[in-house]
C-alpha cells in the first residue's frame, strides 16, 4: 500500500493567521468578550475547541448585542465597508484577519466603483467572501457563477471584473470570455489566490495517479468542495470527509494507492489522523 499526500494541502496562510490570532487573543486573558463574525473557518473541530476556550460565534444580525470594548474577529473571508463603519460607531475592538488576497479584491472593487465602473464578481453570491466584496461597491455588483448567468448580463459601457479567490481557474476563464462580449470597456483582474491554485493543481495531478482519493475538509467549505470536483474527474473513488471518524474499511479495502488532499481550513493534525486511520484499516504501516 502507498499513501500519497498532495504537495499542497491543508491550512493556507490566511486561515492559519486567523486561527493563530484567535488563540493569541485567548492567551491575553484580559477579561474582554471575544467573538468571531461567523465561523472563523469551516472546520468543526477548530470551532469546537475555540468555543470551549471562550470564543463565541456571532452572526451579522446579532451584532447589536455587542457592547463597547468587546472584541470581534473579522475572519479571513472579510466583510463590507458598512460593517466596519457600524462597528467603529459601537466602540467594538475589531481584530481584522481578512486574508490579504481578499483585501486586494476589496480594494480593487472599491477603487473602480468610485471611478464609475460597473462591478462584476465571478463567484458564489451566497459565499461570505463574495457578500463582503460586494459591500465595497454598495452591493451593486453583478454576481455571476456560470456561463449562462454571464450571458444574462446587460450590455455595459465599462466594467471591472474580479474573481472569488477560491475559484477554479478554468471556471473563471470560461466565464470571462462571455463577459468580454457584454462589456465595451472591460478591465479584469484574476484575483484567484495562488495558494488556492497550487492546492487545486496538486490535487488534480495526484488524483490521476491513485486508486482512491480522500479530500479532507468541512462539508460547508467552498474550497474543499471544489477540490472534490477536481479529483472526481480523474478518480471515480473520491470521498469528501471531515475527519478520520468518517473513514470505513469499505472505502480503502480494495485499493493499494491512496491519495490524500485537504482544504484550506483543515489542520495538520486532522490530516495526520486520517493517514493513521487508513494505515489501521489496511493493517499496514504504509509509506508516504
Curated annotation (Swiss-Prot):
Requisite cofactors: [4Fe-4S] cluster
InterPro entries for this protein: LytB/IspH
Coiled-coil features, chain-numbered ranges: none
Binding site for isopentenyl diphosphate: 42, 77, 127, 221-223, 265
Keyword line: 4Fe-4S, Iron, Iron-sulfur, Isoprene biosynthesis, Metal-binding, Oxidoreductase
EC numbers on record: 1.17.7.4
GO MF entries: 4 iron, 4 sulfur cluster binding; 4-hydroxy-3-methylbut-2-enyl diphosphate reductase activity; metal ion binding
Alphabetized Pfam families for the sequence: LYTB (PF02401)
Gene Ontology BP terms: dimethylallyl diphosphate biosynthetic process; isopentenyl diphosphate biosynthetic process, methylerythritol 4-phosphate pathway; terpenoid biosynthetic process
Pathway assignment: Isoprenoid biosynthesis; dimethylallyl diphosphate biosynthesis; dimethylallyl diphosphate from (2E)-4-hydroxy-3-methylbutenyl diphosphate: step 1/1; Isoprenoid biosynthesis; isopentenyl diphosphate biosynthesis via DXP pathway; isopentenyl diphosphate from 1-deoxy-D-xylulose 5-phosphate: step 6/6
PANTHER family: 4-HYDROXY-3-METHYLBUT-2-ENYL DIPHOSPHATE REDUCTASE
Protein name, per record: 4-hydroxy-3-methylbut-2-enyl diphosphate reductase
Species of the source: Thermoanaerobacter pseudethanolicus (strain ATCC 33223 / 39E) (Clostridium thermohydrosulfuricum)
Taxonomic placement: Bacteria, Bacillati, Bacillota, Clostridia, Thermoanaerobacterales
Gene, per the UniProt record: ispH
Amino acid at each position: 500500500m502507498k499513501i500519497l499526500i498532495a504537495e499542497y494541502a491543508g491550512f493556507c496562510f490566511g486561515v492559519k493567521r486567523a486561527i493563530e490570532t484567535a488563540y493569541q487573543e485567548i492567551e491575553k486573558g484580559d477579561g474582554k468578550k471575544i467573538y468571531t463574525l461567523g465561523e472563523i473557518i469551516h472546520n468543526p473541530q477548530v470551532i469546537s475547541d475555540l468555543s470551549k476556550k471562550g470564543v463565541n460565534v456571532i452572526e451579522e444580525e446579532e451584532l447589536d448585542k455587542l457592547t463597547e470594548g468587546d472584541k470581534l474577529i473579522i475572519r479571513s473571508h472579510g466583510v463590507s465597508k458598512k460593517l466596519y463603519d457600524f462597528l467603529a460607531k459601537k466602540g467594538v475592538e475589531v481584530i481584522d484577519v481578512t486574508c490579504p488576497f481578499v483585501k486586494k479584491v476589496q480594494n480593487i472593487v472599491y477603487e473602480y466603483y468610485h471611478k464609475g465602473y460597473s462591478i462584476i464578481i465571478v463567484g458564489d453570491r451566497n459565499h461570505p467572501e463574495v457578500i463582503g466584496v460586494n459591500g465595497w461597491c454598495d452591493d451593486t455588483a453583478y454576481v455571476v457563477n456560470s456561463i449562462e448567468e454571464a450571458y444574462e448580463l446587460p450590455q455595459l459601457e465599462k466594467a471591472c471584473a474580479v474573481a472569488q479567490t477560491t475559484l477554479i481557474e478554468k471556471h473563471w476563464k470560461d466565464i470571462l470570455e462571455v463577459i468580454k462580449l457584454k462589456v465595451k470597456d472591460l478591465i479584469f483582474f484574476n484575483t484567484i489566490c495562488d495558494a488556492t491554485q497550487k492546492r487545486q493543481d496538486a490535487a488534480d495531478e495526484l488524483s490521476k495517479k491513485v486508486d482512491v482519493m480522500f479530500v479532507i475538509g468541512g462539508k460547508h467549505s467552498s474550497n474543499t468542495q471544489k477540490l472534490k470536483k477536481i479529483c472526481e474527474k480523474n478518480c471515480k473513488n473520491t470521498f469528501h470527509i471531515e475527519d478520520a471518524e468518517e473513514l470505513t474499511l469499505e472505502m480503502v479495502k480494495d485499493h493499494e494507492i491512496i491519495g490524500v488532499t485537504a482544504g484550506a481550513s483543515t489542520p495538520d493534525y486532522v490530516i495526520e489522523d486520517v493517514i493513521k486511520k487508513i494505515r489501521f484499516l489496511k493493517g499496514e504501516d504504509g509509506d508516504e
